[in-house]
Amino acid sequence: MKNIKNQSQEVKEPDLTGTYTARDYISWKAEELMELIHGRISRMAPGPSRGHQEIVMILGTVLYTHFRSKCKVYPAPMDVYLIHPNEDWKETKNIVQPDICVICDPAKLHDRGCMGAPDLVVEILSPGTAAKDLGPKRDLYEEYGVKELWIVHPVEGTIALHLLENGKYKILPIYAKGKTLQSPTFPDLKVDLDAVFADE
């Protein structure tokens, strides 16, 4: 393992074969972005494409404009510590960085990120992240109670809504270009998909 120094303290970069908690995560000084999924390190993909970032900007602007002071909207990188009720956040083994998250409970906001499930998460698929976004991360969002998950497919020009009902995600009809997405969790929130995928 490689050693790196921060001020007067020497910290080892994490062993990729180990299992860790948030307590370990916040002690690392590694420069690259990473997530913890079931205690295992998952490195973030290299810098996203221009198209990916344009969609982040468009959807982020729509969400920010809609929610204003009612909820907070954050793009990645934003650490989301997925914790169960009464669980010490430092003991969680699941820390993710959604492309966009919406948090309506101010009690979940912390200097380090979000402590608990956001109300709405947006994940934008790319070749390097699709398997993780559609697999373990989706399952974690379901387990920890993210009310609504948007899976954006830039190549197909679609958004799939996953709505949490009785602890399980129900996949709603897919929205495509020419359609207007309406959030079931936030009925006043509508998104024109032609605007989202204008350059795709």
Predicted regions and their residues:
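Gly/Pro/Ser/Thr-rich low-complexity, intrinsically disordered segments predominantly at protein N-termini
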Residues: 1-200
